[in-house]
């Protein structure tokens, strides 16, 4: 039996050693993802209900609906619309649904939930909205849904665009 374990002794100076320090992240947590045309976007994590990887046959097509709608999905007893986010933003490249799984980001505001199908999920990152710039070289079809963009490299060739989930949810494009 040990009478004085090492963790009970000491002056408490260990807590100030650099390897024990936890850096607090700057900014807000965002989900990064790609559309079929390989453009990278982000959504604020607080507005995301969940991210789902599912088989395309779980999305029920709706006849005579807008081409940007892939169909509906039963999400824990709630039926939600699922859209090809790239086409919703005006991209001509449609999402390939002939694959084993599709990534769907379920966004929510108040009681409204919509699924946004994307090509690939990039991960979660802490991003500082204070460094957000005005979007440049964007199509008119995408402009109403952007809050801004971050330039990711010094050449300003690679950007990450922040989407406005409220504008997406309230868009008249859902009407067809």
Language model region names:
Residues 1-176:
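An acidic, low-aromatic, low-complexity terminal/linker signal
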């Amino acid at each position: 039996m040990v009478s004085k374990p090492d963790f009970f002794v000491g002056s408490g100076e260990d807590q100030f050693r650099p390897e024990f320090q936890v850096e607090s992240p700057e900014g807000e947590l965002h989900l990064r993802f790609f559309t079929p045309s390989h453009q990278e976007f982000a959504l604020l994590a607080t507005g995301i209900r969940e991210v789902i990887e599912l088989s395309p046959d779980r999305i029920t097509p709706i006849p005579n609906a807008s081409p940007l709608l892939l169909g509906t999905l039963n999400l824990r007893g709630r039926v939600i619309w699922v859209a090809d986010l790239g086409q919703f933003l005006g991209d001509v490249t449609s999402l390939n649904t002939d694959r084993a799984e599709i990534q769907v980001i379920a966004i929510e505001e108040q009681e409204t939930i919509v699924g946004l199908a994307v090509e690939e999920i990039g991960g979660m990152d802490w991003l500082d909205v204070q460094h957000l710039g005005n979007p440049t070289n964007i199509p008119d079809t995408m402009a109403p849904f952007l809050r801004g963009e971050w330039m990711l490299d010094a050449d300003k060739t690679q950007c990450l665009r922040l989407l406005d989930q409220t504008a997406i949810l309230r868009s008249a494009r859902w009407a067809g």
